[in-house]
């Protein structure tokens, strides 16, 4: 009983702050979406499409953060402080370099990028302007992602939560002032939303840097300990990072193909999908803490050689995810109409959004369990090739073909298109369960 109580407490300590942080960000994103929604369908669709391309960068940085988390958690389990420091700084430098590359691309070629998403000239212009401006968030986002990973592995997930609360409040306030023109500032519309996002992301990063100065004791070498260098087991490192980068980028490209499908169906379809994003973020955010808890708890068990304990912990986390996801699906079904009624958009868009949310509620349990399996459990051993295989098969062998067929061959409406392409989650879940039960994902990382 004490073991179970200790495990549940450990899960709550890690999962609740992460879930609150994600839900908070999604809640404020919903408020931002409502503000942008007052600007009409073109701006709603434009911001949504720009966000889809920016998500490619987000998943690349997330992959780097995930590798950092795998390494830090396992080396903490091994009680190897020098490897913890090396893991953090190596991934931080790589993340900063990739952030700079994406920023240059989005600044120089925003119109060309957005032209791949929509043929509507006005929507493309709005999306290109927004994309160019929010590229200023890429560098601080990289730093904040790595710092959040470090704090969570140190079992201090409240620190990034506090920073997110303050930055989200700042973002919402600035959005209101800049979008609608308050406190003597002229209305800036979508440009105002972008500026608010950049400022709040920079503030978030600076706040976490301040927290690091008081809580980053592991990054400081004690007397007699080796200082952090970039000398490491690069073969092992790239064997973790490259599959994650491939699967995350390929998955994100698949999501962008989905966005392009919606955009080429109609502006109304694209706007309806955009309106569902805050709800999707809230639902996944409410349970994403279980995935983060899995990566830290199971990673430490694997690092210390406790494989049976890791497997038992994984099964308990999957049970928590199954119960929570079914509960949230029911809430989505009963609140969808009230949520859509908030927006000042055409009734056709509202009806589409409600139907899409119903379809989303059906696949939520599979999405959540896949998040815990692929995003936390299976990758915690560092053998990320399994995750790459699962994501590539699900997205490109099932999701994308079903999306293209249902939209352009079968000519189905957007709710049916979304539901059919989301069936890839069921395929992904089946493969993940097979990999999980075979236990070949269990692995202890080597130190230099």
Q: What are the roles of these predicted feature ranges?
A:
Residues 20, 24, 28, 57-61, ...:
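Residue-level hotspots within pore-lining transmembrane alpha-helices
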């Amino acid at each position: 009983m004490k073991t179970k109580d200790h495990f549940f407490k450990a899960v709550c300590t890690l999962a609740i702050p992460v879930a609150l942080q994600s839900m908070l960000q999604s809640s404020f994103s919903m408020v931002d979406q409502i503000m942008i929604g007052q600007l009409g369908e073109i701006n709603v669709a434009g911001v949504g499409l720009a966000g889809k391309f920016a998500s490619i960068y987000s998943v690349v940085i997330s992959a780097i953060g995930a590798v950092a988390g795998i390494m830090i958690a396992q080396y903490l389990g091994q009680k190897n402080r020098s490897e913890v420091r090396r893991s953090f700084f190596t991934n931080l430098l790589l993340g900063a370099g990739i952030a700079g590359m994406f920023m240059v691309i989005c600044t120089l070629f925003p119109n060309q990028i957005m032209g791949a998403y929509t043929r509507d000239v006005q929507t493309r212009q709005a999306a290109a302007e927004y994309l160019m401006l929010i590229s200023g968030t890429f560098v601080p986002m990289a730093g904040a992602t790595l710092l959040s990973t470090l704090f969570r592995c140190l079992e201090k997930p409240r620190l990034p939560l506090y920073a997110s609360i303050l930055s989200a409040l700042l973002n919402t306030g600035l959005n209101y002032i800049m979008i609608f023109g308050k406190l003597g500032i002229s209305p800036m519309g979508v440009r105002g939303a972008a500026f608010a996002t950049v400022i709040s992301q920079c503030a978030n990063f600076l706040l976490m840097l301040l927290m690091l100065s008081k809580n980053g004791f592991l990054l400081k070498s004690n007397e007699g300990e080796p200082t952090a260098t970039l000398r490491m087991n690069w073969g092992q490192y790239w064997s973790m990072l490259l599959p994650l980068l491939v699967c995350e980028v390929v998955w994100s490209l698949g999501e962008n193909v989905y966005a392009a499908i919606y955009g080429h169906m109609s502006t109304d379809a694209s706007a309806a999908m955009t309106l569902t994003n805050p709800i999707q973020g809230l639902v996944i955010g409410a349970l994403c803490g279980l995935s983060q808890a899995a990566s830290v708890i199971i990673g430490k068990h694997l690092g210390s050689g406790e494989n049976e304990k890791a497997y038992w912990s994984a099964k308990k986390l999957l049970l928590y995810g199954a119960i929570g996801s079914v509960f949230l699906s029911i809430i989505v079904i009963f609140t969808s109409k009230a949520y859509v009624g908030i927006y000042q958009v055409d009734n056709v868009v509202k009806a589409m959004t409600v139907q899409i949310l119903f379809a989303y509620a059906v696949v939520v349990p599979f999405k959540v369990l896949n998040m815990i399996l692929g995003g936390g459990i299976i990758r915690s051993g560092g053998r990320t090739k399994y995750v790459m295989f699962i994501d590539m098969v699900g997205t490109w062998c099932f999701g994308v073909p079903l999306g293209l067929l249902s939209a352009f061959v079968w000519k189905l409406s957007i709710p049916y298109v979304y539901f059919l392409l989301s069936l890839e989650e069921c395929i992904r879940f089946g493969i993940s369960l097979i990999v999980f039960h075979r236990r070949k994902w269990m692995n202890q990382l080597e130190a230099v």
